Amino acid sequence: IMFITVGVVNMALGKKFILASNSASRYSLLKSAGLSFSKAPPFCNEEKIKKKLLQKKINKKNLPKHLAKEKALSVSRKNPNKLVVGSDTIIIFQKKIINKAKTLKEARKKLKQLSGKKHQIISGASVCYGNKQIWSIKQQSTVTLKKISDKQIDEYLKKTGKQILSSVGCYQVEKLGPQILKSIKGDFFNVLGFPLFPFLSFLSKVKK
């Protein structure tokens, strides 16, 4: 677990950047941290890049760092004089990458699969400037779900509705997730999808 001082946070505030992301949760997380930034969608085909990387047989755990870099670079090319931040998160369960559910039926199946078991959440972040990557990081956390029955899963999904589909793990730890989570080992913000503390530490060292 990484700890961060008030001084580092204060130095990070006011450093402007562009978040290369369509993720509402990452946007909300960084806004809640008091950071100054704008948002731009990545100009890249994430699924195509992911497929190519996996064909090259890269270590699955490094996938978020690679995808974060591609997202940041795609926006940096159009904004070469600004800091651009990209990020990506994956779940690995039983050595396989778990993709986002597209329907509530798929979400139900996924929660049933994860029930009572551990899985790894790996987030990567990349900062680019002048079309070049100047910083990157990868963090891993382990999440364990409670043993949940089919009835509990149905009740949970009824409460969350389709908004749960925006969460890779289908539990949204920042909302109703604690109802079905047993434990989190590692950085909490990493589970939310962004390695916040290391990023704040980096940002505090950037000259305005």
Where on the chain are the PLM-derived regions?
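Short beta-strand-to-turn element immediately C-terminal to the catalytic PLP-Schiff-base lysine
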Residues: 92, 128, 183
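Generic enzyme active-site microenvironment
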Residues: 86
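Acidic low-complexity segments
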Residues: 132-140
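Active-site-adjacent loop/tail segments of enzyme domains
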Residues: 89-119, 145-147
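GST superfamily/GST-like fold recognition
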Residues: 12-35, 107, 117, 140-208
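Anionic-ligand binding region
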Residues: 124-125, 132
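N-terminal polybasic phosphate/anion-binding patch
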Residues: 6-83, 96, 151, 155, ...
